[in-house]
């Protein structure tokens, strides 16, 4: 992360609005949570570990003065997904946007070495979780003419080594998002995708496990560094969910520092 980044000023575009963020208590998801909170949004944040969610709630509420509702859920379990949506909407009254960020996978494992369990981990935590959250959030988003921002990855766009199950889940999310954009457009609900390349706890672990691949990745980024989760990823999610992007739907935005250059 570049320590010389300029100070960012926020416009409170989401003051009085309510946003659901999966995996919003840590990593890139925490950066997204901070970005929406800085714009005045009240949040429903989900994850598997209550202590991390409660810590994020305390810190976000203290810094930004918004309300945060933490709810534990396994995104791959449809019944559990219903809980954060119902609980959050009950406390916050409405839902204006959903950001599906959470994902688990067996990275660094070649396709021929992948097990069904490896694939299930990626598909259930990513593709199924995104499907379940979209499906059950839609009735509320329809009422507010809301927006969905889903997370995919350069792993699928560019065929990254050792990422077959992760790429499969993420490309499934991209395809599903485009279909949803077509189906939900008449109801005023927009659906877009971001493919981030951001520094996070998971990436730091990957750096430790695969230092040579990490250095090769850094060298392939024209801007020379990974994104800041809040400023570089979260603020784009805010834009896509805001009125400024009211005519943007079904799109994939690559946030790769130039490493995702395409014709």
Protein language model features and the residues they cover:
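Substrate-binding pocket helix/loop in short-chain dehydrogenase/reductase
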Residues: 109-111, 115-123, 217
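Active-site helix of classical SDR
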Residues: 134, 169, 177
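Conserved glycine-rich cofactor-binding loop
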Residues: 18, 25-27
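Residue(s) in the substrate-gating loop at a strand-loop-helix junction
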Residues: 153
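Catalytic Tyr-x(3-8)-Lys segment
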Residues: 212-231
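Short C-terminal tail/terminal secondary-structure segment
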Residues: 9, 108, 158, 219, ...
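Short, small/polar-rich loop/turn modules that mediate ligand/substrate recognition or access, typified
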Residues: 185, 190, 248-250
């Amino acid at each position: 992360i570049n320590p010389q980044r300029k100070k960012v000023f926020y416009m409170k575009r989401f003051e009085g609005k309510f946003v659901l963020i999966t995996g919003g208590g840590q990593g890139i998801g925490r950066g997204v949570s901070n970005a929406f909170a800085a714009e005045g949004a009240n949040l429903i944040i989900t994850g598997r570990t209550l202590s991390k969610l409660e810590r994020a709630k305390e810190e976000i509420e203290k810094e930004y003065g918004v309300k945060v509702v933490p709810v534990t859920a396994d995104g791959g379990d449809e019944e559990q997904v219903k809980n954060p949506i119902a609980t959050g909407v009950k406390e916050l009254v409405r839902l204006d946007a959903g950001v599906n960020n959470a994902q688990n996978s067996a990275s660094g494992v070649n396709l021929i070495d992948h097990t069904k369990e490896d694939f299930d981990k990626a598909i259930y935590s990513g593709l199924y979780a995104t499907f379940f959250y979209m499906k059950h959030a839609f009735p509320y988003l329809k009422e507010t003419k809301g927006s969905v921002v889903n997370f995919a990855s350069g792993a699928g766009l560019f065929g990254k080594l050792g990422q077959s199950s992760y790429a499969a889940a993420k490309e499934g999310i991209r395809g599903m998002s485009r279909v949803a954009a077509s189906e939900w457009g008449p109801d005023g609900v927009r659906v877009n995708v971001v493919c981030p390349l951001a520094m996070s706890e998971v990436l730091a672990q990957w750096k430790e496990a695969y230092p040579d691949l990490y250095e090769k990745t850094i060298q392939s980024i024209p801007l020379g560094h990974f994104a800041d989760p809040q400023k570089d990823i979260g603020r784009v999610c805010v834009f896509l969910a805001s009125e400024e992007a009211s005519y943007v739907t079904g799109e994939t935005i690559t946030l790769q520092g130039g490493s995702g250059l395409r014709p």
